[in-house]
Amino acid sequence: MRLRKLMALALLLACIGGKSVAQTAPYEPSAENLRSRAEFADMKFGIFLHWGIYSMFAQGEWYLQNSGTDRNEYAKAADAFYPHRFDAKKWVEAFKDAGAKYVCFTTRHHDGFSMWKTDASDYNIVDASPFHRDVVGELAAACHDADMRLHLYYSHIDWTREDYPAGRTGLRTGKKPENANWAHYYDFMNKQLTELLTRYGKIGAIWFDGFWDHDSDSIPFDWQLRPQYDMIHRLQPACLIGNNHHEAIKDGEDIQIFERDLPGENTAGFVEKAASVSRLPLETCQTMNGMWGYKVVDQNYKSVAQIVQLLINTSGKGANLLLNIGPQPNGELPATALDRLKGVGKWLRAYGETIYGTTAGDMMPQPWGAITRKGNVQYVHITDNALAGKPLTLTLNSKVKSVSVFGTTQKLPFKQSKDKTLTLTIPTHPEIIDYILEVRN
């Protein structure tokens, strides 16, 4: 009898141990996920959209936090949110014309307002506003019809729900800290994520934000990311996961995000030191003007040339550019943003071959420009017009067979030393956004 009890106990411990190993085993992406990663890495250009009831205040997406408005007073804005000029098809047409390959939309930002018909809360655009239309659903349909990949932004934090354990933001909205209930909030999030991944067709990626809200906690906060990531991958194995946490990648993630910075840099100051760059597909998100959400006084839009040069430098780092627009409260995209999209689209129709499907070149971006690679061809993007008529030295890794001006038959003389260093003179040319050389290995 004692022997049987010992054997039963040993079997139980073995089962428990096996379960523990299974739960902590490193994430292994599926074949569908790996294909999705490769497709994503080739896209190079996407559009980010920050839109919610915060657009009505015209002060950016952090208005609730920055103003210290009571959450109940803020929520009254939903009663008047009626974006009658919203047309998902027109949005997607503008993005495709701009050369974008995917769209990332804020389904729910830090203010907690959901932009779809969610059963997990009545604080959403269908139930809490007179608009009564499912924006996520309409955008998803438009994207699928146009063969545009749809990514969904989802905030891990909430400045209005009392069950969310507040971190360093959202402390002046009238929430009662003693009512925090992480288990309840975590269940709420997973219910919403399940809706997003089961109601709107194929989702290219889930883009998380808010991890940084607890980066000052004395005891590290457990976001329980891995179980949530596993749930997403079970629902849609090809769905990529990215998290704007400003840290090294976490187990279960499929892409690495850099906010307002090129990969590996920290000019925006979001991390104490430059985050290590992983071997995952990379994405840089950047605003078209100064804010993510609509801000009426922010008319400091980047020029077409600046956006193109940002795209070039991002591609030169082997990353995608996710360019943000804050739609107006009436549902229209700002006229200046549309103008910039048209300009970028015109450039990409002429030179997209040097961007789409490329990887980083032999040199990282330089003050004069950047290099992208496709097969045995490297595209040298010279964005500094001051180099016209002057010599340029390139540190390359392979022997060069020819150098020509992209899109022409003009061959350029060059010299290459034994250590593969290439020297040539840039032809004189009129001022241009990007003078491109085609270097064949």
Please report, for each region that a protein language model flagged, where it lies by residue:
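Bacterial Sec-dependent N-terminal signal peptides
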Residues: 1-24
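Mature catalytic domains of secreted/periplasmic carbohydrate-active enzymes
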Residues: 23-441
